[in-house]
């Protein structure tokens, strides 16, 4: 049964009438451009064919009812006329409440809604299950009530909800790609202007995501430390963000910086340049150059930004040994575990899967999870 069929059937059972529409918003994987988003830089993600799906209908009162199919059909209910506060027990409900609360601040011309939510974006893998939920909820209200909001505004609203209501610091990339993704394309995003450029993906190339299943423990504290180090670097150059510093300016005075901060800054500056070049390489179908840029990105995350772990490095090496210069592979996401992403000619996918199955667990004691994805369309009706 598809997610659409599942949520529609649950909706009718739970609420006693049929849903009027079903909305989806995808998860994402970032092909290159890591930790550049909060430095006002560039990222190159694509939406993937794993999504959050919501069957919904407007109500003629001010009540919101939400059922979470993936959490034992837990039900949350709140009013649009009372202050929206955090749910005491259901963490999932806070993403919904946060989006609705922040949408009220932007455009309060919507009424109540019934929703049933289900999704298949793997959680805790760094594939943005939370952003896809935020964008899906925003899109539901936008579509049901014809709100004059575009994808970028729905994305910004989701980011605000996550930062201010849920209390998790995140950049804008995850929500933007979920809202604006384009089938068979990646999206080059300028995280300062929020300008986007669709970049066509070469034909016959699979987007493979492999979860190391190494449990991330440091990710919150270390993420904040990296952010502070980048801000320290920007202050040193008297710029609002590292986006405004050139590699030449950095090289001239790198020796004056704290050595750790210097390494962090160098990663951001070189990663921004790589990301812009990667968009051109992809568009020209130059998988060899894309592979080189992904390899440089991984080395920079490992040596300068220091956010990889041995298990991730092992996975990258196993994949690289199979694909050579026919594709690319690197860690993706915040770091300290999580996933790697690879662009692989479709005919090499079975060989990569076999090599990983034979070697990764033997070397690390952990079993990986393997996903073959397609670059997919952003949020909308399904």
Curated annotation (Swiss-Prot):
Binding of ATP occurs at 124-130
- Catalytic residue positions: 174 (proton acceptor)
Recite the UniProt keywords alphabetically: ATP-binding, Carbohydrate metabolism, Cytoplasm, Galactose metabolism, Kinase, Magnesium, Metal-binding, Nucleotide-binding, Transferase
Residues engaged in binding Mg(2+): 130, 162
Top-level EC class, please? transferase
Q: Which terms in the Gene Ontology molecular function aspect does this entry carry?
A: ATP binding; galactokinase activity; magnesium ion binding
Disulfide pairs?
none
**For the site Transition state stabilizer, which positions are given?**
28
Q: Name one GO biological process term.
A: galactose metabolic process
Catalysed reaction per UniProt?
alpha-D-galactose + ATP = alpha-D-galactose 1-phosphate + ADP + H(+)
Positions that bind substrate: 34-37, 223
Compartment(s) where it occurs, according to its Swiss-Prot or TrEMBL record: Cytoplasm
Any one GO CC term of the record: cytosol
User: Is Acyltransferase a UniProt keyword of this protein?
Assistant: no
Q: In which pathway does it act?
A: Carbohydrate metabolism; galactose metabolism
Which InterPro entries does the record associate with it? Galactokinase (IPR000705), Galactokinase_bac (IPR022963), Galactokinase_CS (IPR019741), GalKase_N (IPR019539), GHMP_kinase_C_dom (IPR013750), GHMP_kinase_C_sf (IPR036554), GHMP_kinase_N_dom (IPR006204), GHMP_knse_ATP-bd_CS (IPR006203)
Enzyme Commission number, as recorded: 2.7.1.6
The reply to whether Protein transport figures as a keyword in the UniProt entry is no
Q: What does this protein do?
A: Catalyzes the transfer of the gamma-phosphate of ATP to D-galactose to form alpha-D-galactose-1-phosphate (Gal-1-P).
Query: Family per UniProt?
Result: Belongs to the GHMP kinase family. GalK subfamily.
The protein here is known as Galactokinase
Q: Which gene encodes it?
A: galK
């Amino acid at each position: 049964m598809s997610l659409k069929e599942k949520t529609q059937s649950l909706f009718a059972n739970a609420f006693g009438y049929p849903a009027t529409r079903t909305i989806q918003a995808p998860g994402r994987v970032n092909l290159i451009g890591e930790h550049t988003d909060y430095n006002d830089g560039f990222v190159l993600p694509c939406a993937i064919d794993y999504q959050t799906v919501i069957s919904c209908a407007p109500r003629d009162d001010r009540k919101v009812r939400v059922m979470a199919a993936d959490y034992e059909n837990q039900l949350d209910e709140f009013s649009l006329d009372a202050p929206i506060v955090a749910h005491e027990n259901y963490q999932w409900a806070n993403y919904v409440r946060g989006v609705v609360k922040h949408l009220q601040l932007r455009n309060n011309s919507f009424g109540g809604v019934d929703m049933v939510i289900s999704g298949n974006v793997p959680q805790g893998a760094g594939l943005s299950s939370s952003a896809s939920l935020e964008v899906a909820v925003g899109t539901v209200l936008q579509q049901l009530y014809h709100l004059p909001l575009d994808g970028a505004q729905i994305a910004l609203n989701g980011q605000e909800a996550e930062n201010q209501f849920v209390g998790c610091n995140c950049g804008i990339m995850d929500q933007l790609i979920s809202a604006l993704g384009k089938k068979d394309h990646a999206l080059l995003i300028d995280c300062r202007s929020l300008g986007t450029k669709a970049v066509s993906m070469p034909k016959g190339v699979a987007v493979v995501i492999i979860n190391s299943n190494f449990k991330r423990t440091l990710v919150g504290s270390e993420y904040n430390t990296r952010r502070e180090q980048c801000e320290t670097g920007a202050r040193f150059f008297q710029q609002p963000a590292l986006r405004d510093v050139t590699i030449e300016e950095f090289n001239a005075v790198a020796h004056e910086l704290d050595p750790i901060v210097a390494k962090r800054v160098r990663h951001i500056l070189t990663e921004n340049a790589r990301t812009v070049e990667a968009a051109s390489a992809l568009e020209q179908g130059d998988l060899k150059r894309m592979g080189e840029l992904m390899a440089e990105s991984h080395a920079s995350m490992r040596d300068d930004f220091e956010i990889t772990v041995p298990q991730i490095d092992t996975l990258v090496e196993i994949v690289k040994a199979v694909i050579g210069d026919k594709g690319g592979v690197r860690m993706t996401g915040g770091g300290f575990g999580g996933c790697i992403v690879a662009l692989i000619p479709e005919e090499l996918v079975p060989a990569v899967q076999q090599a990983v199955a034979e070697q990764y667990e033997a070397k690390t004691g952990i079993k990986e999870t393997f996903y073959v994805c397609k670059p997919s369309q952003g949020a909308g009706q399904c």
